[in-house]
């Protein structure tokens, strides 16, 4: 088995999918996990990007089905901007599409800035822009877990195969969640599901960005990665990609393994 095949298997990627079937499977997963845990529903941060839009709509469909079947479940969507978000219109469009039971908004700027200032005062150095970006991601997850803890809700994560293979998420930030309904999907497959669900094309054709950096607001994921999503998707779907691209992907996969595992102990062997 080639490394490419090993990665596809490890990340549960299918080269070809039926969007209708995948939507059904992922809604059922959300419902089944909710029933098993006894939780009262879900909470998810909504950025206006493809991934949170898809996960949010799946979550709302799942809790609606639970209620229709006589159960009790709710979904809370959370806007978590840092000051003014450049693409706020897209976030509002996503919320209109998702139709969450409840939507709330937290501006994380005061919390992030207070921490950054305290760090500088205590350690006599400023956080790098990159590390401050990770603080933003982690504060967003702290907020979601606070809501989830108060309301008895599970926190949904938006990680999918194209992010997982590169480790393109913040450890214990957007990478910290209770369940991941988009696991196994490539970026283009996620677009296919949103299209099937009837989302406005603006929500799945927009340029993907983590938008965590103050110095480079709205920087494209592809710029930061040095790899396009089409290249990642081709690789993950078992297609041929240029050797240098495959090398980049495989290198990122290997060095980011710790981000896909629980904290290491001396009894684990994945890190050796």
From Swiss-Prot:
Taxonomic classification: Bacteria, Bacillati, Bacillota, Bacilli, Bacillales
Positions annotated to bind deamido-NAD(+): 138, 171, 178, 258-259
Binding site for Mg(2+): 51, 163
Alphabetical list of SUPFAM superfamilies matching this protein: Adenine nucleotide alpha hydrolases-like
GO biological process, one term: NAD biosynthetic process
Record key words, sorted: ATP-binding, Ligase, Magnesium, Metal-binding, NAD, Nucleotide-binding
Gene: nadE
Pfam families: NAD_synthase (PF02540)
Known catalytic reactions: deamido-NAD(+) + NH4(+) + ATP = AMP + diphosphate + NAD(+) + H(+)
Source organism of this protein record: Bacillus mycoides (strain KBAB4) (Bacillus weihenstephanensis)
Similarity comment: Belongs to the NAD synthetase family.
Chain residues that bind ATP: 45-52, 158, 187, 209
Alphabetical list of InterPro entries matching this protein: NAD/GMP_synthase, NAD_synthase, NH(3)-dep_NAD(+)_synth, Rossmann-like_a/b/a_fold
Protein's name according to its UniProt entry: NH(3)-dependent NAD(+) synthetase
Subunit structure: Homodimer.
């Amino acid at each position: 088995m080639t490394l490419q095949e090993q990665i596809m298997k490890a990340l549960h990627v299918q080269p070809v999918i039926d969007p209708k079937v995948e939507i059904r499977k992922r809604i059922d997963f959300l419902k089944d996990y909710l029933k098993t845990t006894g939780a009262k529903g879900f909470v998810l941060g909504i950025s206006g990007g493809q991934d949170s839009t898809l996960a949010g709509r799946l979550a709302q469909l799942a809790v609606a089905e639970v209620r229709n079947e006589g159960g009790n479940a709710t979904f809370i969507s959370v806007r978590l901007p840092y000051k003014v978000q450049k693409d706020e219109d897209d976030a509002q469009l996503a919320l209109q599409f998702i139709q969450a039971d409840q939507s709330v908004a937290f501006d994380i700027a005061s919390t992030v800035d207070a921490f950054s200032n305290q760090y500088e005062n205590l350690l006599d150095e400023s956080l790098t822009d990159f590390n401050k970006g990770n603080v933003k991601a982690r504060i967003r997850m702290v907020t979601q877990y606070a809501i989830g803890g108060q309301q008895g809700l599970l926190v949904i994560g938006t990680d999918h195969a194209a992010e997982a293979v590169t480790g393109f998420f913040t450890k214990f930030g957007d990478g910290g969640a209770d369940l991941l309904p988009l696991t196994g999907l490539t970026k283009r497959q996620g677009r296919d599901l949103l299209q099937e669900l009837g989302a406005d094309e603006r929500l799945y054709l927009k340029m993907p960005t983590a938008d965590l950096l103050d110095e480079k607001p709205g920087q494209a994921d592809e710029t930061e990665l040095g790899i396009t999503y089409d290249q990642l998707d081709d690789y993950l779907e078992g297609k041929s990609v240029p050797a240098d691209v495959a090398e980049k992907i495989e290198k990122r996969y290997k060095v980011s393994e710790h981000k896909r595992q629980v904290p290491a102990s001396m009894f684990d062997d994945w890190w050796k």
